[in-house]
Curated annotation (Swiss-Prot):
The gene is fliJ. InterPro entries: Flag_assembly_chemotaxis_eff. GO terms for cellular component: plasma membrane. Signal peptide: none annotated. This is Flagellar FliJ protein. It comes from Buchnera aphidicola subsp. Baizongia pistaciae (strain Bp). It is a peripheral membrane protein. Flagellar protein that affects chemotactic events. Belongs to the FliJ family. Keywords: Bacterial flagellum biogenesis, Bacterial flagellum protein export, Cell membrane, Chemotaxis, Membrane, Protein transport, Transport.
Length: 155
C-alpha cells in the first residue's frame, strides 16, 4: 500500500514538474506574441504614414527613380508585415498546442490527487480496522482474565 502511494506521489510530482515547464513555455510564447504584435503595429503605422507621404508627393510629381525607391521601400514594409503575420500564426499554433498539453497534464494531476486521496482513505480505514481488532482482542483478553479469576475464586 505504501509503495503504491509513493509511486503515485512520484508520478504526480513528475506531472506537476512537466506542467510547470509547459506553463513556462506558455509564458515565453505569450511574451513573444506580445512582442510580435508590437512590432507589427509599428510596421503597420509606419507603412500607413509612409503611404500618406507618398500620396502627397505624387500630387506634386516625383521623378521615376525616386518613385522606384518608394515602391521598393513599400515592398519591404509589406514583406516585413507578412513575415510578422507568419510568426504570429506560428506562435498561436504553439500556444494552442501548449494549452492542450497543459489541460492534459491538469487532468492527470487531478487523477493522481484522486488516487492518492483514495489510497489515503483506504489506508485510514485499514488502520481503523487494525485498531478495532487490537481493541477487540484486548477486550477479549480482559474478559478471559476476568472469567479466569472468577473460576479460580470458586475453587
Amino acid at each position: 500500500m505504501y509503495k503504491k502511494k509513493r509511486c503515485f506521489t512520484l508520478l504526480k510530482y513528475l506531472d506537476v514538474k512537466s506542467n510547470y515547464h509547459i506553463v513556462l513555455n506558455l509564458k515565453k510564447i505569450l511574451s513573444g506574441i506580445i512582442q510580435v504584435k508590437a512590432q507589427l503595429d509599428i510596421l503597420m503605422s509606419y507603412q500607413c504614414e509612409y503611404l500618406k507621404c507618398l500620396d502627397q508627393e505624387l500630387k506634386f510629381y516625383i521623378s521615376g527613380t525616386r518613385l522606384a525607391h518608394y515602391y521598393n521601400f513599400i515592398a519591404f514594409l509589406i514583406d516585413g508585415v507578412n513575415k510578422q503575420n507568419d510568426t504570429m500564426c506560428k506562435l498561436y499554433k504553439q500556444y494552442n498546442e501548449y494549452i492542450y498539453l497543459w489541460k492534459k497534464k491538469q487532468k492527470k494531476i487531478k487523477m493522481w490527487n484522486n488516487i492518492n486521496s483514495r489510497l489515503l482513505l483506504n489506508r485510514f480505514k485499514l488502520s481503523q480496522l487494525d485498531d478495532q481488532d487490537l481493541l477487540d482482542s484486548c477486550c477479549t483478553y480482559k474478559y478471559l482474565l476476568k472469567n479466569d479469576r472468577e473460576d479460580t475464586d470458586y475453587v
